[in-house]
Amino acid sequence: MNAKFILLLLVVTTTTLLPDAKGAEIIRCSGTRECYAPCQKLTGCLNAKCMNKACKCYGCV
């Protein structure tokens, strides 16, 4: 019983700490305009925003 709980806790902790694949490439920015060109190269769309000095690229709708 105790071993199963520890294993479950380990799995949950590991999955929450792993970075997602989409955010693996970090593009630094100081304004949203700096994100348009790099995000267009990655996703093919201009949908982007600068948040916490890193670009957040959104896909095409």
Curated annotation (Swiss-Prot):
One of its GO terms (cellular component) is extracellular region. The lineage of its organism: Eukaryota, Metazoa, Ecdysozoa, Arthropoda, Chelicerata. It is found in: Secreted. Transmembrane segments: none annotated. This is Potassium channel toxin alpha-KTx 6.9. Expressed by the venom gland. Residues 1-23 form the signal peptide. InterPro entries: Scorpion_toxin-like_sf, Scorpion_toxinS_K_inh. Has the structural arrangement of an alpha-helix connected to antiparallel beta-sheets by disulfide bonds (CS-alpha/beta). Keywords: Disulfide bond, Ion channel impairing toxin, Neurotoxin, Potassium channel impairing toxin, Secreted, Signal, Toxin, Voltage-gated potassium channel impairing toxin. Belongs to the short scorpion toxin superfamily. Potassium channel inhibitor family. Alpha-KTx 06 subfamily. It holds the Pfam family Toxin_2. Disulfide bonds join 29-50, 35-55, 39-57, 45-60. Inhibits Kv1.2/KCNA2 and Kv1.3/KCNA3 voltage-gated potassium channels. GO terms for molecular function: ion channel inhibitor activity; potassium channel regulator activity; toxin activity. It comes from the Eukaryota. Its main location: secreted. The record marks 49 as: Basic residue of the functional dyad. The record marks 58 as: Aromatic residue of the functional dyad.
